[in-house]
Amino acid sequence: MNHFMKIIFSFCLLTVCLLPLSAQEKLQPKALIIMIDGMRADAYDNIPMPNLEKLRAGKWQPGYQAAFTLTGYNIEDARPNSAPNHASIATGVTATKHKVFKNGQTKDGNFEEWPSWLARLATSPQHYKTQFLYSWGENKDTAKHPDVPFRKGKDPENGDYLCSLYASPDGGPDATLFFIGEVDHSGHSDGFYPHSQKYINTAIETDVIIGKLLDTIAARPTFANEDWLILITSDHGGYGKSHGMLGGHANTIPILMVGKHITQGTLPGLPRNYDMPVTALAHFGVDVKPLNLDGHVIGTEVSKIQRRPLKEGLLAYLPFDTETPVNVAPNGLEIAVVGQNIKSGVDGGKLDKCLRIPGGENVRECIVLKNTEYLKLENSNNFTATMWVRLPPTHVGNPPIFSNKDWRNGARPGFVICGARNINNPTNPGVHFNFGRWHDTHRTDMGIYDITPDEWVFYAVTVTPEGVACFCQGQPDGQFYWIVDGSIKDANLDSGMTWNIGQDGSAAYRYNLQGDIDDFALWNRGMTVDELREIFQAGRQNHDLGSLLK
C-alpha cells in the first residue's frame, strides 16, 4: 500500500470511529414505568428520597436528563382511586374508554379495544419483551394480555425479581411496568396527609427499591448501547387515611421523566399520569397519533417561565407591626380598616406583631384593599397571596380569610380562602379555597387543609401563567403541602367587589373571621411552588417577607 493510500485508509478509519453511535449502531430502546401507589406530589419534597432526587437533578448517568413536575394530575372522568388510574397508566386512555370507573371494575375493563402499552409492544413486529409487576390483587386483570408476563408479589420481592431479570444473560424485558403499593397501604393505615411517620418510612423504603433498580440498569454490560426511558408517577394522593375525594388532595401527583431525549427542567402546565404510556410507546418508535389515545407525548418541552424578583408585581405587603396597618409595598394599594375592634400591632405575631380580627356572627371587621374591584392581573387571572394565619380550635360558619366574592354562594364570581370544616371530623376547623367559574359547575373547591389550633400556619394561593391554581399550606413542623387544579383556566374572578382580609368581597358576610394574620402579601402575578416554599421556610426561621424583598 503506497503512502497516499495509507493516508486515505487512516482517514476513513478515523471518520468511522468518530461517527455518532447512532450512525454505527442504533441504540436499543428500553423503558421502565414505575407507579408509586398513593404518592402525593409534596411527598417528593417533604421526604428524603436520594435516588429519586438524583434522577430529578439529571445526575443519574451521563447523557440522561430529567423533566419533573410538582403539579401533575390524574384522570378526571373517575374519582381519584387506584383501579381507574392503574388502567390509565397501563393504557394511555381515561375511564370513558377503558371503562374502569372505580375499584372492583378492572375485570370488566375494555382492554381488548384499549390494550396496555406493554401489549402493543409485545405484539409489534419487533416482539419486544415485556413485564408487569404488581402487589395489589386487582391488578391481575389490569389490561391482561397473553403476551405480557404478569407477576404478583410484595414490593421488595418484585424489585429484586426485576433486578434479576435486568442482570440476566438475555437482558430481561425491553419494556416494564412496575406498580409499587406499600406507600398507599401506609397512607390508609396511618395517614397520607398530614404525612404519617409510617407513610414517610415506606416512601423511603420505596426509594431504596428504585435505587437498586437504577444501579442494576446502569451496571448492565449493554447499557452503553441502550436508550433508557424511566418514567415515575402515581395514581393518586390522599387526605387523612383515604382518597377518592375531589378538591386536590387525591388528584395532585408527581411526574418524573428521565431519558436521553428528555429536556432538563420543569414540565409545563398540568401533565397527566396517563401521558406516561403514550410517551413510552413513542420512545419505541410507535406512531401514537392514529391510536386515538388520551395521553400525549411529553418531556421534550419544559416550562419557559423565568423566575422574577420577588418584589415584581407586589401590590400589598402588610406586616401588621404598627397600630395603624400600613401597606409598605412601593406604589402599593391603599387600605382601609372596617370596624372598631380589629387591631393591628398586636403582640405575639408569627414574625413580630400581627393583625387580630374579632369573629362571630353578624360582625363586620376587616381590612379592605381599596380600588381592587377590577384589579388588573397578569393574563387576566394570575395572582398570588401569602400569609400566616392563627385560628382558634372552633369557629362559626365558614368565615372568609381573604376574598373578593359574595360568599353567600360559592358559584358566584370571585374567590375566597376561608375557614371551613374538616372533611373527616366536623368539629375540627380547616381552610379551603373556592373560586367561581364560567363552566356549568360554576365553582371549584380546593382543600380542605387541617389546622393546628392556636398555632401559626402558612397559607398561599397562586394562579400561574400556565393555567394552574395551586393552594399551599406550611405547617408548624416544617411540612409544606400543596394541591393543584386546572379548572382555573375558565375561572371567573371578576366579582366587581373589593379584595378584603377577614371578610368576603361585600364586607357583609354573616360570619366574620376570628383569628390572627401576619405578614400578608399580594401580587398580581403567579409564582412557583419553589418560591412559595422559600417564603414559608424563611418565615419558619423568623425572617419576614420584607427581608426577602431587599
Which residue ranges define each predicted feature?
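Non-catalytic, well-ordered alpha-helical segments in soluble enzyme domains
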Residues: 269-303, 524-525
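Long, well-ordered early-domain segments
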Residues: 52, 59, 81-138
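Histidine-centered active-site microenvironments of extracellular/periplasmic hydrolases
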Residues: 231-261, 486-487
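Extracellular glycan-associated modules
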Residues: 307-550
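Metal-dependent active-site segment of extracytoplasmic phospho-/sulfohydrolases and closely related
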Residues: 33, 51, 205-246, 280, ...
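Active-site His/acidic residue clusters
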Residues: 138-150, 162, 166-208, 212, ...
